[in-house]
Amino acid sequence: MDSSARTTQFLTRKIDVMSVYLSNEWPQIEKRANVKFNILRVSDFGLNLLGASIIVGNAFAEQSPETVRKLLRATAKGYRDAIADPKAAAKTMAKYMRVPEDPEVLDRQVEATVLSTNAPPGKPIGWQEAADWQANLTLLKETGGLPEIKPLNAYYTNDYLQ
């Protein structure tokens, strides 16, 4: 079910529970319903979902490693700036949005996004742990979303963050 249909089903109380992206859907739905919802974070139950990711083709990464590193450094700087001043980050984002977002919702979206970086202590923003990948892949395989689990280096690398 697509997210708009799922949201309609939830807001009309045809379903009682739905999964959402905390960084964008949750603030929008609460604003739309004018209700504060109870949130069950899967991380509270031991599953650290992989958050925002940058996907780069292997060939491009191999041919342009410095470009990938620059993109990751710029992205990390954006996250650090947003962490330091979420309201300023939301105002900057608002300038570039084709479809304007309610300022209050956008503030909450930025706040939720910066909380979801889940980089381990001492590691750069964007760093991902092998154990988190393994847990996510195992869940996908067990629930039928993935036919087989390949070696972890087929899915991600932290090499360009170093």
Q: What do the PLM-derived regions correspond to, one by one?
A:
Residues 5-9, 13-99:
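Pocket-lining segment of extracytoplasmic ligand-binding domains
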Residues 28, 47-48, 111-112, 157-159:
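Short secondary-structure boundary/hinge segments and terminal tails
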Residues 62-143:
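Secondary-structure end/capping motifs
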Residues 133-162:
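Conserved C-terminal helix/tail region of periplasmic/extracytoplasmic solute-binding proteins
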